[in-house]
Amino acid sequence: ETTGATFNFDFWRTCEPRRSTYPACRAVIAAGLQTLDARRAMYDAIQNAYFLDARNPSLSEELISISGEIGLDSTLFADDLGSNEVASRFAAERQACRNFGVTGFPTLIWSWQSADDEDASPRYGLLAAGYTNLDTLLSRWRSLMN
């Protein structure tokens, strides 16, 4: 069984693969400094650049180019990409992952907030670490909601 996902295999012929996704992760955070919606837009654009366009999301120049393509201020993005603020936020997000026991992908963490208390901090729960069938996923989600 396959997902039907499209993948441009030219990446392996035209790019020098790197083993780190950290630059792409920092790019998502840097995009989010401009607008919250930009985090998702950058994530989607990086996925398309890698899987469909055979572009290397480990390269800062590619990430800066992508930022302009999705309508961000690419000069500001370039500054933010290497900033202490982005490094600090990325470190905090990695620590949060370690706190959940995340060691790989795919991982699904559910975030929710009480409708009765808008000032309460969001709560988080681990739904899946690695492949999880739908029945198990739904069971875990229901237990978090109770």
What role is predicted for each listed range?
Residues 1-54, 59:
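Structural alpha/beta surface segment adjacent to cysteine/selenocysteine redox centers
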